[in-house]
A protein has these predicted regions:
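Active-site-adjacent structural elements that line small-molecule/cofactor binding pockets in enzymes
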Residues: 1-168
């Protein structure tokens, strides 16, 4: 699934609307499942994280050109970026679109952590999530072992399933 989703938009717009729907239906957070959401960029160190952020430029420029996602950009003060990307898309300037997205834009929309920080990050910042997913290199036996170790730690993270401040 592609698109633009940020933790801020999730917390300020989406989850409050889900809460309203739950209240109207007489249901509770435990009646639904929410997958971990928002751009989360994970790497071994700041350099790898920055490279992965920069690798998101093409996708963000494409989705950001689509007016459907301008509300997410607006939440972050990036509405002008969305308008510029849309105009460039109408002109077929795909490379220029990618180059329009800056590292500052990416840092505004994404959250980052290292692989070692991931379990703590999920517990502190994705407390609403019933499910989480992540990717990392698994091409060698050592990488696979590291992945399995991190996977066990992530699976051990207990979350409330209730967004902070949106209890029913």
């Amino acid at each position: 699934h592609g698109g633009i989703m940020s933790d801020r938009y999730m917390r300020e717009v989406l989850l409050p609307n889900v809460r309203t729907g739950l209240q109207r239906a007489g249901r509770d957070w435990s009646d639904i499942e929410i997958s971990e959401s928002g751009y989360l960029v994970i790497g071994d160190d700041d350099s790898e994280i920055e490279q992965k952020l920069l690798g998101m430029r093409r996708a963000l420029s494409f989705y950001g050109s689509t007016r459907t996602y301008h509300e997410v950009l607006r939440t972050h003060g990036l509405e002008e970026l969305g308008q510029k990307l849309h105009a460039l898309s109408l002109q077929g300037k795909w490379e220029e679109m990618r180059d329009t997205v800056t590292l500052d834009d990416l840092n505004e929309l994404a959250q980052t952590c290292t692989y070692d920080e991931l379990p703590q990050f999920l517990g502190e910042h994705r407390e609403y999530a019933s499910r989480s997913g992540f990717g990392m290199p698994r091409g060698t036996p050592a990488e696979e072992e590291r992945f399995q170790d991190l996977l066990a730690k992530v699976q051990a993270v207990e979350t409330s399933g209730v967004p902070k401040g949106l209890e029913l």
